[in-house]
Amino acid sequence: MLLHKLKEAKVTGKIGKWIAAFLNSDHRRQAVAVEGVMSSLSPVISGVPQGTVIAPVLFLLMISDMAREVSSCTRVSSFVDDTQVKKGIKDVANDCLTLQSDLQAIYDWADDVGCQFNSKKFECVRYWPGTESPEQPYLSPDGTPIQEKSHLRDLGVELSDDCSFNLHIENVVTIVSKLIGWVLRTFRSRTKLVMLTCWSSLLQSRLDYCSQLWSPSDQASITKLEAVARHFTCHIEGMEGKNY
């Protein structure tokens, strides 16, 4: 299937032959070494080779047509081997059925191309700012309901079903506070040069990561974040009483 997609993508000639030879099971063999003893070689008959420079490109090519299987109002996004299917729900009865139909179309696509989804890792989050969200269950490929969660971590940001970032802010404050404790225990110098270097290289990136998305407007969250910075700056020579 992957070789067929390479041809569809116009990857031919010497490069196409080289990749085909790379994927050919006759040339792909692996062994396991345990305590200096090597097992016999066994052929690798399926899958995209992992741990190679070209593997991410081949994987993206493998799943490139997955998004075409769903309806136009459903979005499919992938990062590495994680895939998200998203749909805005306006008409609960019809839109939920459409989303389940789109999920089934993706399951069928996976069967056609020889891919497998790990149903144990399936998660469903309903982003619903109101008090009650639709209770329509969604099914995994084996017919079991997909596990529902109140939040998920997407590229390092906690997304909660109530459309707030309170959980993410709490996690950021906890992580940065622990890092500050480690810095204060590790570095005895409290000069501006040392401490501000530690702040900019180790701590600030944790506080600022994706802040354009989750930057709070409520005073309680702002106070939590400022308290972290204040706790650090009060240990810097000449900045003990810095006014925020």
Tell what function each PLM region has.
Residues 6, 19, 32, 51, ...:
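Mobile genetic element proteins and their domesticated derivatives, centered on retroelements
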